[in-house]
Amino acid sequence: MYKRQVFTAEEAKAVANRLGYPVLVRPSYVLGGQGMQIAISDKDIVEFMEIINRQVQEHPILVDKYLMGKEIEVDAVCDGEDILIPGIMEHIERAGIHSGDSISVYPAQSISQKIVDMLEDYTIKLARALHVKGLINIQFIVYNDQVYVIEVNPRSSRTVPYISKVTGIPIVKLATQVIIGNTIKGLGYTPGLQKKADYIAIKMPVFSFEKIRGADISLGPEMKSTGECLGIAETFNEALYKAFIGAGIRLPKHKNMIITVKDEDKQDIIPIARRFEALGYRIYATLGTAKVLKENGIKVIRTNKLEQPAPNLMDLILGHKIDVVIDTPPQGVEHQKDGFVIRRNAIETGVNVLTSLDTAEALATSLENTDLNNLSLIDIATIARR
């Protein structure tokens, strides 16, 4: 990825304009994505630089080109020569949302064999080049049928327990053995990417926003989840459904939802809204979103924005009439105030709030063709041995 180190707002603006917006602005060393921001204008750069410099002193700040692609994650074990890759994990949310806050799917469902081969090849080359003995974690972006490296971590990651559990490969034990001199082949394993499972395992982030007053629930580069859960099934839909339930997504009572999305998402929301309509949802939307949905044959009830007379969005939310809010915040700091009020009040009222179209699409998928009264039971202790 294209990257530059800067120290001042003027330097950051120059790099951002050379790379082209949007860009990712972040401290040179962070944990959990702390201080990371996506900037879409010079105004954002100035504000973000002030925030970062208040938190991190005397360290360079990185400005990267931001690519809206498919994020992929790989954990592997390297003995210095051979590399074992238990599996490839695909994030449902596009790049820009912290990996710890993204829904992760094993095995990856939407990438081609060509991309799989590239991911395996890059993982092997990177592990060897870095002389890794033990665990390595690599995060990739697939963008326009090309693979880019986001970051390489020569260590364990939060996905290690997940990928070990769902593949049955004890990669922590293997990493420990290779660190003390054993080899992957000597431990009885074939190097390379292992055969993918015939079931779907989904890692779902768990949030505690209702307990953290004043926290904005919109997702971005900074990690906000406080836990995770696992959904396993033989179909993608059912695995998603189990994961959503495990994460605390409440089942609909009224089948009423609010949709309010940024301008860039108005065309992409159309097929998603159509799917929820087919599931029996009544859709409320503000003027701009309602106009687009209505023009595309979707039944929608127009409602007023916060600053407009009642009944408006807040009346619907506080009246306990809404099950789901889909609200995609516009990028940039100057646009976020009204959306924050909507999201905060919704979460405090017990309403499910989704701030990514990818998550909203996943929720629709989980409700389609899933027999809610006949969910399968999966034995996690034996399924990976099949």
Each model region followed by its residue ranges:
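Conserved small/polar residues in nucleotide/adenosyl-binding loops
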Residues: 1-5
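Conserved beta-strand termini and adjacent loop/short-helix elements that scaffold enzyme active sites
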Residues: 6, 64-66, 286, 303
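Acidic, glycine-enriched active-site microenvironments
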Residues: 135, 143-146, 156-174, 178-187, ...
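Gly/Ser/Thr-enriched, mixed-charge loops and adjacent short helices
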Residues: 14-15
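Short acidic loop-to-helix transition motifs that present clustered carboxylates
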Residues: 6-11, 44-45, 68-70, 264-266, ...
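ATP-dependent carboxylate activation and anion-phosphoryl transfer catalytic cores
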Residues: 19-22, 31-34, 38-253
